[in-house]
Amino acid sequence: MAHNGRLTVLTGPSGVGKGTLVKRLLDQHPEIWLSVSATTRQPRAGEEEGVSYFFHPRDTFDALVAAGGLLEWAEFASNCYGTPRDPVEEHLAAGRPVLLEIELEGARQVRTSFPDAFQVFLAPPSFAELERRIRGRGTDTEDAIQRRLARAREELNAQNEFDAVVVNDDLDQALKQLETHMQLQAP
């Protein structure tokens, strides 16, 4: 049984495997509610409004920020991303475990609003492996890869700010560690 109403924040650099790990976690623990972020970026193939993200034009996103409607937000790679506040608070009040998969600046903002949130940093086994994974995606220009790698160095330097660090070397082991940190029992 999950510890009801616990907020867990998962952060890590681009290419570390957050998406894969979260998908496995949700497959095994349907009681977890994964927050859906709002973004100003364009949808990618296969992404659905309200499932993958809430896609907003910049003026709508800025209005959400001004109204206090986002728990956290940041600009990354020329796009804005943020966590809508109301659904997070509603699910926590209903006693559900809530997971935020967000970037470093967002995690720092959540620390202010929800100091009891448990924050987990997902780290690669090495920087070389992270670079291999990012390049292996085949979706970015060399310029974009260099920006992601520079950002990853900054993020890796911040991992001591987190309550726990999980190294994503072996997916099954990383999943077990995340389940433990989230106070979940293996299915």
Swiss-Prot record:
Transmembrane segments: none annotated. ATP binds at residues 12-19. Its EC number is 2.7.4.8. Residues 5-183 form the Guanylate kinase-like domain. InterPro entries: GK/Ca_channel_bsu (IPR008145), Guanylate_kin-like_dom (IPR008144), Guanylate_kinase (IPR017665), Guanylate_kinase_CS (IPR020590), P-loop_NTPase (IPR027417). Belongs to the guanylate kinase family. Essential for recycling GMP and indirectly, cGMP. This is Guanylate kinase. It comes from Synechococcus sp. (strain CC9902).
